[in-house]
Amino acid sequence: MLTAILLVSLLLPASALAKGAFGYARASSQLEHDSRPARYQPLNMVDGRAATSWCEGARGDGVGQRIVVGFQAPVSIDEVRVTNGEASSRQAFKANNRVRVLTLSNELARHTVTLSDTQRPQEIKLGKPLEGERFVVEIQEVFRGEGEANATCLTDVVFVSGGKPLSGPSLAGKLGDRNGAVALMGSWYSGLEGAPERFLDLYFDKTFRYRYQPFDPEEPGEEIRGEFAFDGKQLRLKPSGKEWVEASAALKAEESKDGLPRARLVIAAERLDGSLARSWSDRP
């Protein structure tokens, strides 16, 4: 069963809808695993493998927890293929919570999806495609597991465009922990809360894109692309055509005005201009 709630129609020209490469998956929380830090990381939800899953790690049953999935160019999503729960084994599936209802949204539209309580993959056709670069998968209701952890898990949400998976098995083997870089991957925003003018995307393939989009039409914008590396402590950036620059990256959690958690990334470097060296938030 699929219930689609259309808030505003977003129509992009067909020429603008590139087959965007997968960019990142960023979660509001993940279940900690002492011996394997990447065991329940958000990238597991897009690799198309039953042996891996994302499990949220917030207090409660997981309702309201989310994963933001980003692409490196605009895409049109007309189908998702969902494998519910922790599907690596029947025991793990029954022990952990599964998702009963989730929402899939972009900035302007939202679909509500009701799932079955099964380990088998479920194909969900979207009545109206979602278009853009950034999509949010959010847990709305759960099937309660038999274990004590009370963690809700999703094994896979594969995004499909015109019958072609844009995430899934093609990414298997490419989505390791990245030496802690998974904590930085995602879209970051700088400027007034709710009205940012600067955007920084850090992708799983170790590339980045920075954009300055001023509200003043008389002021020129800016775009910088390049590479980044992060070993869990030291951040290095290489804007296209320039040398590598060492920077510090401080990541911390804080609360926003609406009471929901947000992450704050502060990048500082002597040889990096103010475009990139500033304070960033993972929420607009």
Q: What is each model feature region?
A:
Residues A16-Q72, R90, K94, G163-G186:
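Disordered, acidic Ser/Thr/Pro-rich linker "stalks" and the adjacent N-terminal cap
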Residues V75-F93:
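A short beta-strand element within beta-rich, extracytoplasmic domains
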Residues L2-P13:
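Bacterial N-terminal signal peptides
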Residues G62-G64, Q72-R81, G132-E133:
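Extended extracellular/luminal ectodomain segments enriched in beta-structured repeat modules
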Residues D61-G64, S88-G168:
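Trp- and acidic/polar-enriched beta-sheet ligand-binding modules for extracellular glycan
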Residues V137, V157, P165-E223, Q234-P284:
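Lipid interaction determinants
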